[in-house]
Swiss-Prot record:
Keywords: Cell membrane, Ion transport, Membrane, Potassium, Potassium transport, Symport, Transmembrane, Transmembrane helix, Transport. The gene is kup. Pfam families: K_trans, K_trans_C. Coiled coil: none annotated. The lineage of its organism: Bacteria, Pseudomonadati, Pseudomonadota, Gammaproteobacteria, Enterobacterales. It comes from Wigglesworthia glossinidia brevipalpis. The chain crosses the membrane at residues 15-35, 58-78, 103-123, 140-160, 171-191, 218-238, 251-271, 282-302, 340-360, 366-386, 396-416, 422-442. This is Low affinity potassium transport system protein Kup. InterPro entries: K+_transporter (IPR003855), K_trans_C (IPR053952), K_trans_N (IPR053951), Kup (IPR023051).
Length: 625
């Protein structure tokens, strides 16, 4: 019996430990700034029991209702084979509603994702600057070097991204677990001094706060958005853990530690109002302060690294779903494909971080520019979830819809309370999001138009093969593969090959690689083959958006299904379109020029599908768009 209890205890601790870095490391540094920043917005909040108890009550119930009930109970149940995130939710919702509304859902999903991108690139700056500014309060000489130190840390952080392997996750999880325990212990000191602070859990203090400060009270959410928006990144990463593991680690470890610390800070501010500028480190004993500063910097780097990893993952997902051009993606771990590194995204975000710090300079200004994109994304997540549950027949349907409607109303007020940030610098992430959206929609629309343009005169494959018999073309030994982007259409590469070379191989494969909405495709459903006439074969390979197509794997399944193929005896014919700008209105001409630029800088099928370079024959085709 004792052995069973020990195993259960060990299992519980392992659950917390395994999720702590990936899911909750992002929120780890927030106790340093969340309380003090709630008071510095010049909204007339007095440093008294009413304000302190009220703000603590708001933090507690907001985290409970939005992060725990909304996300960890309801939203995580809406997933695609365990995968979450706004793109996944968009895809699931689009399937549930009528086709006329699908376009609107997709556009809203893309807009929210891009705006969220614009916001989350600010979080690393906030995490790192918050710690350095706290250090400068105790070590005044640091104040002159905040900018230089921040840039140095960012340079180090972005430089090591390619070196970080999945195996480091255990080290990061251990450090963040220790940090959360330390955060809780620091808070306990304040609670011990004034235990009455725990009464702030009572929602009556929240109500009294809103009664007294009226509309101004909502502006507290301008700071709290930093805490609650982390739930969107948590939703993106749910695929690596079970729902029960995520709920346990939040409810029994992370949430209590954060709230204990917040209550401790509230207690010390009530007793020593002068500590409002640095309540977190005010609770730390003098002898432990240097260690805590050092540890906090390390945690801020790990927290920032998690943000960057989430950005890499979202980018790869967008690439695989066809919303971004093919770009170089490196897998830094042989064990799990989630640990990836994307050089161009890494350095774009590094440049963005440098610009942020250069323009906005301090923590308060950085917090002022954060929140618009996040709350829009959170509201759309709620809206999409409402549509999902409305179409789904299940238990407690009415209760779920009522709860989500209530949350949507609350999020509307949070949006209003953050809207003033647009004139305070909030335009920065919005502009970034608009640029990102423009790139995504341009690539998706123009790629589709290009496919239509290059295939609109094509006959069906079977008719094409039938007509080839009349030409009596010379046949040579070996196998040729022609990449096809659309079903039942003739690849341009074979048309140009026949036109210029006037020969065909004995075995000809029309290969169509499809990316499905699911994260993974079962191995037994990976490849479908169709035997056509005259030595022609049709092959369709299916991959999930989390998987990377591999020509060797496709050939392996083809061999199992009856086509004898050898990569080193196969020639791959790939079309290389040279795009020329045709006559268009000026606004469409700008979009076309952007597409031409993206197309020229995107990677071709050779890299995308790991095709051996010495087996590739590229055929240049000039296309007017």
């Amino acid at each position: 019996m004792n052995m069973i209890k020990k195993n259960k205890k060990k299992s519980f601790l392992c659950t917390i430990f395994s999720t702590i870095n990936v899911l909750h490391g992002l929120i780890a540094i927030s106790p340093i700034y969340i309380i003090k920043e709630s008071f510095v917005n010049n909204l007339g909040f007095k440093i008294d029991k009413l304000a302190i108890f009220g703000i603590l009550s708001i933090i507690f119930w907001t985290l409970f209702f939005i992060i725990f009930l909304k996300y960890l109970i309801l939203i995580v149940s809406i997933n695609n084979s365990g995968e979450g995130g706004i793109l996944t939710l968009m895809s699931i919702t689009a399937k549930k509603i009528n086709s006329k509304s699908t376009f609107v859902i997709v556009i809203l999903g893309l807009i929210s994702m891009c705006l969220f991108f614009g916001d989350i690139i600010i979080i690393p700056s906030i995490s790192i600057i918050s710690v350095i500014e706290e250090i400068s309060i105790y070590y005044l000489s640091f104040e002159k070097f905040i900018f230089i130190i921040s840039i140095a840390i960012f340079t180090f952080l972005f430089f090591i991204q390619k070196k970080i392997k999945n195996e480091f996750n255990n080290i990061f999880s251990f450090l963040i677990s220790i940090w959360f325990i330390l955060v809780g212990l620091i808070g306990l000191k304040g609670i011990y001094i004034n235990p009455e602070i725990l009464l702030a859990i009572n929602p009556k203090y929240l109500i009294n706060f809103f009664k007294h400060y009226k509309l101004n009270a909502f502006f507290v959410f301008g700071t709290l958005i930093l805490l609650i928006s982390i739930s969107e990144i948590l939703y993106i990463n749910i695929g690596r853990f079970s729902k029960l593991e995520i709920r346990k680690s939040w409810l029994f470890f992370v949430f209590p530690m954060i709230m204990i610390n917040c209550f401790g800070q509230g207690s010390i501010i009530l007793l020593y109002p002068e500590s409002i500028s640095h309540p977190f480190f005010f609770l730390v004993p003098d002898w432990a302060r240097f260690f805590t500063f050092t540890f906090a910097i390390i945690i801020s780097i790990i927290s920032s690294q998690n943000i960057i990893s989430s950005i890499f993952y979202l980018t790869r997902q967008a690439v695989r779903l066809g919303y971004l051009p093919n770009i170089k993606i490196f897998y830094t771990s042989e064990v799990k494909s989630r640990r990836i590194y994307i050089p161009c995204i890494n350095w774009i975000f590094y440049l963005s971080a440098v610009i942020q710090i250069s323009i906005f300079k301090n923590l308060h200004n950085l917090i002022l520019i954060y929140g618009i994109g996040s709350i829009i994304t959170m509201s759309l997540t709620t809206f999409f979830s409402l549509l999902f549950f409305k179409k789904k027949f299940e238990k407690f349907k009415i209760l779920k819809i009522t709860f989500l409607l209530t949350i949507l109303i609350l999020e509307f007020f949070i949006f209003i309370s953050n809207s003033y940030k647009i004139i305070c610098g909030g335009w920065f992430p919005i502009v970034f999001g608009i640029i990102f959206f423009t790139i995504m929609i341009t690539w998706k629309v123009e790629t589709f138009n290009l496919l239509l343009h290059t295939h609109n005169n094509s006959n069906s494959i079977k008719l094409f093969i039938k007509n080839l018999r009349k030409n009596n073309l010379l046949k040579v030994n070996g196998t040729s593969v022609f990449m096809s982007s659309m079903d039942n259409t003739i690849p341009l590469s074979i048309i140009h090959n026949i036109k210029h070379n006037k020969v065909l191989h004995e075995k000809i494969i029309f290969l169509n690689i499809k990316t499905e909405d699911s994260p993974f495709i079962k191995k037994e459903c990976r490849v479908e083959i169709e035997k056509l006439n005259n030595g022609f074969w049709g092959v369709k390979a299916y991959y999930g958006f989390k998987e990377t197509p591999d020509i060797k794997e496709i050939f392996h399944f083809c061999n199992l299904l009856g086509i004898s193929l050898n990569i080193m005896e196969t020639s791959f014919f790939i079309s290389h379109e040279s795009l020329i700008l045709g006559k268009r209105p000026w606004y469409l001409a700008i979009r076309a020029k952007l597409f031409i630029f993206l197309k020229r800088n995107s990677l071709g099928s050779t890299y995308q599908y790991s095709i051996p370079l010495d087996r590739v024959i590229a055929l240049g085709i000039q296309v007017k768009i």
